[in-house]
Amino acid sequence: MGQLVSFFQEIPNIIQEAINIALIAVSLIAILKGLVNLWKSGLFQLLVFLILAGRSCSFKIGRSTELQNITINMLKVFEDHPISCTVNKTLYYIRESENATWCVEIAALDMSVLLSPHDPRVMGNLSNCVHPDIKHRSELLGLLEWILRALKYDFLNYPPLLCEKVTSSVNETRIQINVSDSAGSHDFKETMLQRLAILFGTKLMFDKTPKQFIVIRNQTWVNQCKSNHVNTLHLMMANAGHAVKLRRLQGVFTWTITDAAGNDMPGGYCLERWMLVTSDLKCFGNTALAKCNLNHDSEFCDMLKLFEFNKKAIESLNDNTKNKVNLLTHSINALISDNLLMKNRLKELLDTPYCNYTKFWYVNHTITGEHSLPRCWMVKNNSYLNESEFRNDWILESDHLLSEMLNKEYFDRQGKTPITLVDICFWSTLFFTTTLFLHLVGFPTHRHIQGEPCPLPHKLNSNGGCRCGRYPELKKPTTWHRKH
């Protein structure tokens, strides 16, 4: 008997599914039959003939297409910035600007060109390394500092630099970096070579070779290599500075719709009248809890949050430590609620409505039984506000409740018989009816000379000649045909 009752209860769902299947079948059949009718009407053949057959006497495809390219060179945009290039990925050059007649060369060598006892060490100030008689001394000094800053060279922790001793006979600036493992840490060489690769945007050719020294010196620019704007961007990004990391305040507590053991609670919360609701026992389902999860801006959500925290804190510990747990729970509750209580206390002092977390109001739909998320009934002068004083709030809440009900009804109906499916069925049926009429009328597809075979792929004019000019005009009568 129970199975029979269950069967009769499922009959509406079975009928609804059958209607959906019927709508899908009708839509597919109408679309397929419509396409067949269009093909049989000759419309596709006529369009293909008009597009292809009259262009030329052959079927040449792609005669108006060609491969083209564009090269982007933004050196004019960065002409006042340092520009770099490379020669065989072993020598690197940096110019101060696009119009500079000098440059700085960076090379890796397997032998030292400067000696520590003879040449001075650099502890941070590069001005003693540049000869005072060198032209563009200030620009060269700035470019050297730019390079070392891009390499993130630490004068305090890295091996000291060696620079050419400034004399009256030497008018060249040379700086040497010892990248051997004996000079610094075991990975100092790999670190510096990797930074060079990042700086110049390429893989260094000497990263696996026994090169032990990096030498930086000034040179005259004689077009050693070709520059591009990508290398300039690498230099600019290497000297862009350090990004400031900001901290964003995250949520302190999170909670889900489960009990203390981690099991789902499909029934939601039932709050007793001594807890929140003063009239009687009221149950709030998962919808209210989901709203609190998405938008935590209600005093009711604050109470649910405290209630959930207390319950989990108490039920997850042993009964032998209940006193300590109670003390801990009260302390945490005080910390959590300090902000809320202080906010309401300030409102009370300012003689503005505040919440005492005792009485809550919500909008209830008497027919469906659905209700809105409870909101705090504000207190002013030690008495609850009259309903007329927050009339706009509960009217707006009722509008939101009706909107949610309409949306829910719409999605429920979409789950049974989607409106889109009905629209597809309607338009596919209309498409089939239109194509059926076109099939009955028919379209001519090409022109024939009376009594002659099919001239395809050539397109004839009214005088019987080939429109592309390959064949002379025969001045014979022509007629339109539907089939070949």
Curated annotation (Swiss-Prot):
Sample GO molecular function, one term: metal ion binding
Topological domains, Cytoplasmic: 34-58, 445-484
GO biological process assignments: fusion of virus membrane with host endosome membrane; receptor-mediated endocytosis of virus by host cell; virion attachment to host cell
Disulfide bonds: 85-225, 270-283, 292-301, 355-376
Binding residues for Zn(2+) 1: 57, 458, 466, 468
Topological domain spans for side Extracellular: 2-17, 59-423
Site (Important for GP-C-mediated membrane fusion): 33
Residue ranges of the TM segments: 18-33, 424-444
Binding residue positions for Zn(2+) 2: 446, 448, 454, 484
Family: Belongs to the arenaviridae GPC protein family.
Known role: Glycoprotein G1: Forms the virion spikes together with glycoprotein G2. The glycoprotein spike trimers are connected to the underlying matrix. Interacts with the host receptor leading to virus endocytosis.
Protein name per Swiss-Prot or TrEMBL: Pre-glycoprotein polyprotein GP complex
UniProt organism field: Chapare mammarenavirus (isolate Human/Bolivia/810419/2003)
